[in-house]
């Protein structure tokens, strides 16, 4: 039903990455929950035309625990209470979850389940090497065990349509 709704939209569906990328890029992901909650009501009120709000990724999750000594799940739950009208989106590093090495399948499944229960609506799943087996467990878990959306992603750089580029072409990524 969600895909049907998306296809029917005539407007541009915009994802705001401020709650993840802005402070990750500018402040080494050190934005505290209290600061995010300070602007949450304004986001809910003025961002009501947004498709989604990207508020989680590896660095933001890790930093909230390791440096800010906060529980990232509680942060997500509190933001969800204050911003009930916008889809929440996150980056998920496939078999790495939000960490820096591969985790057992049951850990990835449990993380996804708990994240969805805590308020995550859309999981953008990728693998830095585009190794498809590293995506499978996460993508299957999202599709089969949550009501969340699985947004499968590949990573690339450069101009894939340029005739000057002969290795990483559109054909390369399709195959």
Which residues make up each language-model segment?
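N-terminal amphipathic alpha-helix/helix-capping segment at the start of soluble metabolic enzymes
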Residues: 1-21, 26, 76, 81
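Short glycine-rich or small-residue beta-strand-to-loop segments that form or flank ligand, phosphate
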Residues: 19, 23-27, 62, 123-126
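Metal-cofactor-binding active-site regions of metalloenzymes
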Residues: 91-95
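Surface-exposed amphipathic alpha-helical tracts and adjacent flexible/coil segments at the periphery
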Residues: 1-3, 28, 60-65, 163-165
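Alpha/beta enzyme core
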Residues: 12-14, 31-55, 65-87, 97-175
């Amino acid at each position: 039903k969600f895909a049907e709704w998306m296809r029917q939209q005539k407007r541009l569906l915009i994802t705001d990455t401020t709650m993840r990328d802005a402070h990750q890029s500018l402040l080494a992901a050190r934005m505290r929950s209290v600061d995010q909650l300070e602007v949450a009501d304004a986001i809910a009120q003025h961002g009501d035309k947004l498709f989604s709000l990207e508020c989680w990724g590896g660095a933001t999750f890790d930093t909230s625990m390791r440096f800010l000594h906060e529980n990232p799940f509680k942060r997500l739950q509190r933001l969800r209470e204050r911003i009930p009208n916008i889809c929440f989106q996150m980056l998920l590093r496939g078999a790495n979850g939000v960490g820096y090495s591969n985790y057992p399948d049951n850990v990835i499944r449990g993380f996804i389940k708990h994240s969805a229960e805590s308020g995550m609506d859309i999981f953008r799943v990728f693998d830095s090497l585009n190794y498809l087996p590293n995506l499978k467990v996460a993508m299957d878990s999202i599709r089969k065990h949550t009501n969340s959306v699985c947004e499968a992603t590949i990573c690339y750089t450069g101009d894939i349509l340029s005739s000057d580029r002969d290795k990483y072409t559109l054909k390369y990524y399709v195959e």
